[in-house]
């Protein structure tokens, strides 16, 4: 009887009234989410002589919200060597919440022990990041470790071609940048032609003068007569007994045809001297020009004699390229190839400041000729700068010239990477010696990224090997789409996978959000589904209302649980992240950490105060 009355009560009006009233009371008393008490951040990790990087504070792993006792998300030293990529849209806090705080922590390492100070390379495109790095070093007593290359007041001179990098690698890098900046057609001929021309021009100048600049490449590319003269000069320099023709100045002025040959004035005798090539010898004999023939130990025009057997073989290679390849190309096509590189390299000719900083004369690197520093201070080799703990910054904003800034920055990056990788055999041969770490810090990384299966100096190859050289790569870019648009094909995937730690801030494009969601992985999640059905017996249509009615009706409700594999973080979550809020996929050097929410520490706020407290105060 009581059971029947209870079931009857479930379908009466008082039950629905009481149920609704209790639901309202419960909702009002609950007040939405459970409030959290005061947030107690643990002390920041003490500098105990071990290098580590504090990324931010960690609360709930998969949901946004505070807990009373959060933790710090910290990467130990071994995890730093595997690379950190910061990816976030404009205004999401990449620089203020990641790049500045990370640089502060790394450059402050070692304290007063100069042997532990970390040096490296800083690349950026805006022009303000370098000033922040200088301020960081000054605050920690390292003002003398800062080396800046710029176009305004820097005393340093940097020649991107003055190193021991292979000529093909340098040429390929220049050609790749030209094709990526000014058109990436499917026809590989143009990049191959640019690479071949620049490679042999570099070889030619290194053989003759032990020195080459971007301006030298431009002058030889646009002047076929000069190129021919230097090829002949290299042939002559490789002869067993080199000779020169000597004329009196009056004789030189009497024959106009002599002007087409390169002549120098002897500073002592004031006589005219020129390399005695076959063509010059033939001219002198045909026109009965009074001259003398002398053996010489040095070349006119600042060249050097080539005595090394390997270098003589290289001279023959240059000669074969010039006569059997370059001169056989149709003149129109040859002109197109030259124009493809000359319009860009000409910037080093018509801009005096560029020429002064990036194309210094050979005397700049001669301690005797440049004893008074009149040619500027040559930038020391990166291998020396790294071991001294110096921080090199290229302050060349893209606003001045985007393409040129990328070219110079990329060439400097390649030079730095080569110096870093040369540390690997040294470290392996002396494991008992503690070698200092080195930092590669790049803001707006998509402006400097180079990658590709055929690129001998691709970034993905460097990052895959830099761990052994104790290099810490930290880069920031606006989105995965930025890398995708800069690099060809699917090579961006190869590059992205070399960064084991990925910090995702707010993303504003669908592609990047989807890729970030996939990278964070999937997990088995319990999905709830509801099913409602209604049935009636002896159904009829009410004449007054037009609705279906039934004398006996029943409603059935069912609830089902299914296990599905779904993304841990949906793509929309990455678009909804607030400023200084991130989802981090970290790697500690041994094991990958699960993706988690992380609350970053902007450089202008007290890191000892919780993110949510700053948010409550309106600081974020």
What are these model-derived regions, one by one?
Residues 1-49:
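N-terminal accessory nucleic-acid engagement/regulatory domains that precede
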Residues 33-35, 60, 66-71, 75-471, ...:
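P-loop NTPase motor domains
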Residues 41-73:
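N-terminal pre-Walker A segment at the start of P-loop NTPase domains
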Residues 189-195, 203, 340, 381-383, ...:
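P-loop NTPase motor core of the ASCE superfamily
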Residues 478-482:
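Conserved H-loop
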